[in-house]
Amino acid sequence: MDNVERLMEFGLTRHEASLYILLTLEGSLNGYEAAKQSGISRSNAYNALAGLVDKGAAYIQEEDTVRYTPVAIEEFCSNKIRHLEQKKTELIAELPGKRKNEGGYLTIKGEEHICDKIIDMLLCAEERAYISVYNERLEMFREHLEKMVSEGKKVVIITNEPFDLQGATVYLTECKKEQIRLITDSKDVLTGAITNRYEATSLYSSNNNLVEVFKDALANEIQPVSYTHLTLPTKL
């Protein structure tokens, strides 16, 4: 993901994001200069500059000609996040709660969405989490696993190489690089494969039978890390 795409995540169009980056490099520009330097047509450039002003990403600087100057990136992003947090609070308060998934099977596609679901499961876990994942991918979940440990929750990691996480139990086994499996609180399970950013699919469920199947599967693949002298768990 490049900086244009990152800015688009904050609600800017591609033209707006491109001109915002140009403004941060140049300091301030008028519409003609912005169009000329960006290669965007003059009409599209003026529309994009007006959009930046409307979205809180640029200010108008009144001189002989109207010029545009960028809002600092930290200020712009923080403002967006603050407004979104406020809207999130309002939506949670006003919209009805989601009915719990009663044992259905949900397909989640895309690496980002799968990782988001894993993080949500870790955040919502009340007692324990068992995660089986390739060592290279574990790092993106470290913060949330550490939080669980700090709260006194049980964390068991099954991976292919030693992973240093104080307070967690680590087991080594032959993990497939693309495979991810997670069980939280013996109630929810996620299993899937991430081959690349876009070709990734996982299955999420709270179906008791599926949870039991994967609990048995994880128990069977666990091998204690030699340097910790751990004992095999009898129950996940």
Question: Which residues make up each language-model segment?
Answer:
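Short, Lys/Arg-enriched N-terminal segment that forms or immediately precedes the first helix
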Residues: 1-9
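Short, cationic-aromatic polyanion-contact patches
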Residues: 8-14, 30, 62-82
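Short amphipathic alpha-helical interface segments
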Residues: 17-27
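A short acidic, leucine-rich amphipathic alpha-helix
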Residues: 33-36
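A short, conserved structural fragment
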Residues: 53-61
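PLD-like (HKD) phosphodiesterase/transphosphatidyltransferase domain
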Residues: 74-147, 156
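HKD (HxKxxxxD) catalytic microenvironment of the phospholipase D
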Residues: 169-218
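Conserved small/polar residues in nucleotide/adenosyl-binding loops
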Residues: 228-234
